[in-house]
Regions:
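A general alpha-helix detector
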Residues: 12-13, 28-31, 121, 140
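N-terminal interaction modules that seed assembly of large macromolecular complexes
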Residues: 15-78
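Alpha-helical oligomerization segments
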Residues: 150-204
Length: 204
């Protein structure tokens, strides 16, 4: 599988976006937002935004490949997420499960975060199978993260691209891969967000 290559390419494209002058970056992000709800390649104005320097092995023949879908969704959703937020909404290490946990805790106002309504949305996303259905649920989740109380909650977009690529896996040799992605989401959601005690504290 090309998981790490997809993640690396998404990282490169995000760095390219972030390095643009302000006016040019805003224009590029606005263009990417217009791609929401469309399939990769459907809008010619976006070809360069996600196909620039894309490895030939990523490219589909008769339809968008899993890699093209993954990169396209990561970039267009990042553009939605960044809108209205001054600080970068791409944050390495803040996976989807962790970001949803942060959102649930903020929305629970001191109550049990596991009862937060956002978790029902997350469950709908996690059980979606078709990439278009995944895209629909993910868009709603990104909008919630963007509009979170006390400022938007960022997300690791290269990792999201990798997850989206693996969710589309149909190779029987890697039949467990989509389930493993969902398991990681659940693990990150329920993992204790507090830093572990260091060895000295444990000894005391």
């Amino acid at each position: 599988m090309k998981t790490q290559d997809v993640k690396m390419y998404a990282t490169q494209q995000l760095h390219r976006l972030q390095a643009l002058p302000d006016n040019q970056r805003r224009a590029e992000l606005a263009k990417l937002r217009r791609g929401i709800g469309h399939a990769p390649g459907e809008l010619p104005e976006l070809w360069g935004s996600f196909l620039l320097e894309m490895p030939e092995s990523f490219q589909g023949r008769s339809a968008p490949s899993a890699a093209e879908w993954a990169v396209y969704l990561a970039l267009t959703l990042y553009a939605v997420h960044q809108q209205g937020n001054d600080r970068p909404m791409n944050c390495p290490g803040n996976t989807l499960g962790r970001a949803v946990r942060q959102l649930a805790e903020r929305n629970s106002a001191g109550q049990d975060w596991t009862e937060a309504s956002v978790l029902r949305r997350f469950n709908a996303l996690a059980t979606a199978e078709e990439i278009t259905e995944i895209s629909h649920h993910l868009r709603g989740m990104i909008q919630l993260l963007s509009a979170a109380k006390d400022g938007g909650i960022p997300l690791d977009y290269p990792q999201l691209a990798a997850d989206l690529y693996e969710l589309q896996c149909t190779d029987p040799r890697y039949a467990q891969t989509p389930a493993n992605v969902r398991l990681r989401w659940g693990q990150d959601l329920y993992r204790d967000p507090k830093p572990a005690l260091d060895e000295k504290e444990k000894e005391n």
